[in-house]
Amino acid sequence: MKLFRCVLILLYAATAYGLAQSQSSPKKQLLVIGEEKGYRHASISHAISVIEQLGKQKGLWDTTIRTDTEPLTKKKLEYNARNLTNFDAVLFFTGGDLEMDPQQKADLLSFVHDDGKGFIGVHSAAITFTRWPEFVEMVGGTFDEHPWGTFDAPILVEDPKFPGMSQWGKSFVLRDEIYQMKLFSRDKVHVLMSLDRGKLDLSNPKVHRADHDFAVTWAKMYGKGRVYYSTLGHPEENWNDPRLQQMYAEAIQWAMGLVGPDLTRIEAQVK
């Protein structure tokens, strides 16, 4: 009987501990903005759906989807609408100059830089606010060209230990549209993937980078916050690829601070 009582006590204690843990660790909140001004990417709707499902499957984050910029502010909104203060990270699958007033822009930068929250940029996020220097600085670069269009891109994995990289192997080929970046320097970011320049047609007249450095995916710090960008995700079918799904799922977790590594040292080196 004493043994039975001890077992019951242990079971109740374990249950109480589990409940306390779940109550003290609520799911993170992800805001996804899927708005474009100008060119429309057909893959956005499916991509956002995949991102939402990944959050549900892993039980780590809830996804709020918007096709406007109203939540990108810290001011109180009408009708109990949610704003940046309700989120742990923002994901942009966007394009063009979105409608944001100066205060909204300042709030978005502060959300990452000062509040230590996360920002994830997908593909055409690099064609967003190309003339807003602070946004370009936060992301780590901006669109210049896509010299080879959608092609069988030869990609090297530069840091296989970073979250979301190991499943790709050391190198791989993926049919996607890879952007050439300007206002980009690998000295200011942690490059995770790049094009294998030895397998590219560098005589293409749209190749503008003299260093032939074509980063595909990178991570960086912006103040206290974490920023992740990848040009992958142009074709809709790529969002059905488990490797791409895992990459973005772990990118979101990293940006939210759920997993390492801490890249603060990179920002310190830049300063």
Q: What residue ranges belong to the model's regions?
A:
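Positively charged n-region of N-terminal signal peptides that target proteins for export
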Residues: 1-5
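A glycine-rich, often tryptophan-bearing local segment used as a flexible ligand/cofactor-contacting loop or short
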Residues: 97-170
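Boundary at the C-terminal end of the N-terminal hydrophobic targeting segment
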Residues: 18-22
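Extracellular ligand-binding/catalytic regions of CAZymes and related secreted enzymes
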Residues: 24-28, 42-45, 49-58, 67, ...
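Bacterial N-terminal signal peptides
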Residues: 6-16
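Helical hinge/lid and interdomain linker segments adjacent to catalytic or ligand-binding clefts
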Residues: 31-33, 38-121, 125-127
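Catalytic beta-strand/loop cores that center a nucleophilic Ser/Cys/Thr
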Residues: 62-64, 141, 149-223
